[in-house]
Amino acid sequence: MVDDRQGQRGGRRPRPSGGWSGPGRARPAQPQQPDGRHTPEPGPPIPPGVDARQLAPEIRGELSTLDRATADAVARHLVAAGELLDEDPEAALSHARAARARSSRIAAIREAVGIAAYYCGDWAQALAELRAARRMGSKSNLLALIADCERGLGRPERAIELARGPEAARLEGDDADELRIVAAGARADLGQLEQALTVLSTPQLDPARTGSTAARLFYAYADTLLALGRNDEALQWFLHSAAADVEGVTDAEDRVSELG
C-alpha cells in the first residue's frame, strides 16, 4: 500500500509498534518550590555547541515574555530539538518536552513538541500539540502534518476532509504539494488508488522541478503507479524523483535499481 508518512522507502519514518506517550498516560507528581510553584525537571543535557542564539529570531521573539533564565533554557532545548530531529527524534522530543515544561503557552514550543512527536510516529500527541500551536496563533502551515496525523490514527476520511477545506484551498507551492501527498496517501489507505493518482497529478506534475517536496511528490506518484501495475510509468517517475532529490530525502535511486 502506498504510504507517504515518514517511511523507510519514501524517506519518511514508519509508525512505531507501541509505547506511545499520548495524553492518557499517567504522569508522576511534579516537584514544587516551597511557595507551591511548579519546578520543571531539568530535562536532558544540552548537547555541546548548542547556543540559545542559534534559535530563529522570530521564535526568540515569542520567548520575550519569559524571564531571561527561563528563555535561555527554553531556547537551548528548542535548538537541540531541531538539531536532533532527523537523527534521533526521541531525543528531540525529550528536549521539546523540556521546553514545554518551562512554558506551555507559547505556540512555537507546542509546535516543536508536535513536530518531534510526529517524527516519532506518536500521532495522538503530535495532533494534540499541533492543534494547540494553531490555537495559540502559530504562523507555520501545519495543515499537512495535522492531516497526516489523522491518517496515522486510522482516520483517512478526516484527512481527506481537511484537504478539501477552505484552508487547504488557500495553500500554494510546496505547502499545497505536501497536503496533496497526504491526501493521496489517505485515498490509498481506503484502496482508492485511481483517486490517489488524480490527487497527485492535479495540477499537472512538472518533472523539471527539484527539491525535497518535489522529490516526495514524484515518489508518491511513482509508488501509486506501481501499485496500479503501471511499472514502466512508475520507473520513469522514480527517475524524476531521484533527479529532484538533491537532499537525499527518498530512496528513489534504490527503487530505480529494483525496477530497472
Residue ranges with predicted function:
Residues 1-64, 70:
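Basic Arg/Gly/Lys-rich low-complexity intrinsically disordered segments
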Residues 65-101, 112, 118:
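Alpha-helical segment of the N-proximal tetratricopeptide repeat
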Residues 80, 112-113, 146, 183, ...:
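Structural register within alpha-helical repeat arrays
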Residues 86-87, 120, 153, 190, ...:
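Structural motif corresponding to the intra-repeat A-B loop/turn of tetratricopeptide repeats
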Residues 136-139, 168-169, 198-205, 231-250, ...:
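TPR/TPR-like (Sel1-like) alpha-helical repeat modules
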